[in-house]
Every structure is written in C-alpha cells, then in structure tokens.
Design a protein with these regions (language model features):
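A cross-family "folded-core" feature that marks the main globular domain of proteins
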Residues: 1-335, 339-372
C-alpha cells in the first residue's frame, strides 16, 4: 500500500513501485504453488511452472492484461479431460485469492490448469507401467543386450523387476507379465515368448502383451476402487431436492451422520461451488470440498426423481466426493475414468435408469474398466 501511495504522489516512482509489487506477487505466488504442489503430491518442472504462473498472476495483479480470447472456450474441455488438474487449479486460485485479493474467473482458473498440465504430473503417473520378469539363459552379454533393447524400446511402459533363467523362478515373482526367450512359459503369470534377437516381430509381440497386461491391471485397480469408495448406505434414489443447495445439504448430512466428514465439510463444498460450479456437461454434478477433510474416502450417489437446477444446468445425477488426503493418489485413478464415462451420452442414459446399489456397482464395474 505504501508503494501505491508513493506512485500517486510521485509519478516518477511508478516503475519502482510496479517492480516492488511484481517481486511481492512473485514471492506470494511461489508460496501458494509450494502449498498446492505439496497438497496434491505433484511432480513439477519447477522453474517453468513457477515462471509461467507468476507471470500470469503478476499481470492480473497489475491489471495490465485482459483475456477476451479465452472466454470459456476451453473450460468444458479442461474439466472433462483433466478434472484432476482443474481441481488443482481451483485450489491454487483459492490460495492466491486469499493471499493477494485477486478474483479468479472460470477463464483464469482454466488458464492455471493449462500451466499445471504443461509442467506437472501426479507422483503416481508411472503406475500404469507393467512390471515384468524376463526369462533368459545365464549369458551376461545376452542379458545385457535384452535389457538394453527392451528398456530403450518401451521406456516407462515396462518395468523389468528381475532376469531369471527358469519358469519356476519366474512363477515365484510378483509381476504383471513374463517375457520368455526360451521354450518355457509361465503357468502363474501372463507370458509372451520372443527370440533373443529382438526383431520387429518380437517388439510387436511384447507391445501387444504390454497392452493386454496394462488393461488387466487397470481393470483390477478400478474394480478395487469401486468396492472401496462406494457404500450402499450412501446411495440415494426416490429423492427430489429443489436445488443445488438442498442437494448438497442432503448429501453432506448423510456423510456427516455416518462419521465420514466433519461439520466444516459443508462450508468447504459450498466454497468450492463459488469458484466454479461442479456441474459437468449440463447433466451431472460432482460436488466436493476445497480441502481433504474426510475421515474416510467415500462417494455419495444421488439419482433424483426429477432434474435438479444447478446454476444454468438441469442435473440428473450427483456424486459427492468425500476425500481423505491419504487416499488421493489412489482416488484420482478412479476419478478420471469415472468422469469420462459420464460424458458418454449413451452410458449416461443407461446409468440414469439404475435404481439399486447393486445395479450401480455392476454398471461401474463393467463400464469403467473399458474407459482406459
């Protein structure tokens, strides 16, 4: 404030005052980014991310730039394709708003999501890698050749956990796939047989095996998440809330009565809605708290008797997310395919017909595993 008064009294001080403000804004932005990165357990290209976000926030703080070209053209795409990153951007916008008094529109939040997408990723981004044991005769030169060739060709898609010489040794390992250069095949794990020459045909065979193994791994992980995060006592039909606030209140009450969330959860959900309403595709909503307040991670489900007015949308399905921070890395692996499924108009029409928890579970178990 003192710097701004100085500018008013001495116009020649404007350059110095703006530079002082830029430094202050940059420092605050750095602290908000630090908190966001820690909160969501991100890996980042620190220098590039900090430079991009700081520059953008400085322009907002100094009001030297308008963004008419970004008027909501990418918001829905960002929310549908990268709901995790969009939530990270909302969290960052909240921290920056509290610290700097800047108001962030949906457009500005979308721009933050773009920067985050360019220069960060979740810590568990490599969880899709397929773990493999290679069966190969005990010739060190041959083993070195195989290892180098497989790693170079498949990179982060393949995690080789061991090289063994017999199928019995491979069967004892905990892995997703066995790659065998001998006539022996594993009886315990999926197995692909290749030659030690690593020809184009061999690479094609391993590539196909990796795709199958990754899909099986994804299906098992999602099935486990469905069982873990859904609860029959938090599945509601035959209810007709009059609006979004009533629907949020109803679901928060249910979560609080089961001891899953504390009383302050409700206010955090409503705060999140003020930044960017959680209605997707004008047909379903995914309200959730700004912070990880839940004692346990659960998803409450509401299929109302009639559509609920949610901002400018009519919502026919509500999924309220109660997330515990310890579960977040696992939860986002379930969250992204769930949102993708609900954006499919055919599948969404089918899920609206569901009336029991068992039907809902079976539907998700069958369909979510096909979305990745």
């Amino acid at each position: 404030m003192r710097a701004l008064v100085g500018v008013a009294l001495d116009p020649h001080a404007e350059g110095t005052a703006q530079e002082t403000m830029r430094t202050s804004v940059s420092d605050v932005t750095g602290r908000c980014l630090d908190e966001t990165i820690s909160h969501f357990n991100l890996q980042v290209e620190r220098e590039k991310l900090y430079e991009s976000v700081s520059g953008h926030v400085e322009r907002l703080a100094l009001q030297t730039r308008a963004l008419p070209y970004f008027r909501n053209t990418l918001q829905e795409s960002l929310r549908s394709r990268s709901p995790f990153l969009y939530d990270v951007a909302v969290y960052l916008a909240d921290r920056l708003s509290r610290a700097l008094g800047i108001t962030f529109s949906d457009d500005e939040i979308g721009l933050l999501a773009i920067y985050l997408g360019l220069y960060s990723r979740p810590v568990n981004a490599d969880d899709h890698a397929v773990s493999a044991v290679v069966i190969c005769p005990r010739y060190q030169t041959l083993r070195d050749w195989l290892l180098a060739g497989l790693v170079e060709h498949f990179g982060n898609r393949l995690q080789i956990v061991d090289l063994v010489s017999t199928k019995e040794e491979a069967d004892e390992q905990d892995c997703d796939l066995v790659i065998s250069t001998t006539d022996e095949s594993s009886r315990t794990h999926p197995c692909v047989q290749i030659s030690a020459l690593l020809s184009d045909l061999d690479f094609s065979a391993v590539d196909a095996a990796l795709l199958r193994a990754a899909k099986a791994k994804s299906r098992a992980r999602i099935a486990e998440s469905v069982r873990r995060f859904l609860d029959p006592e938090l599945f509601f039909t035959g209810v007709a809330p009059k609006g979004s606030d009533e629907a949020i209140g109803f679901m928060c009450d249910a979560l609080e009565e089961k001891g899953i969330v504390p009383p302050e959860f409700r206010d955090s959900v409503l705060l999140r809605e003020t930044y960017s309403p959680t209605a997707f595709a004008r047909r379903f909503a995914v309200p959730h708290a700004m912070d990880f307040l839940a004692h346990r991670t659960k998803v409450a489900v509401l299929i109302p008797d009639s559509p609920i007015g949610w901002e400018s949308a009519d919502i026919s399905l509500v999924l309220m997310l109660a997330i515990n921070g310890d579960d977040y890395d696992d939860f986002i692996l379930f969250y992204q395919p769930l949102i993708s499924l609900l954006y499919d108009s055919r599948l969404y029409s089918e899920i609206r017909k569901v009336r029991t928890f068992e039907e809902f579970m079976n539907f998700l178990d069958n369909e979510l595993s096909e979305t990745e």
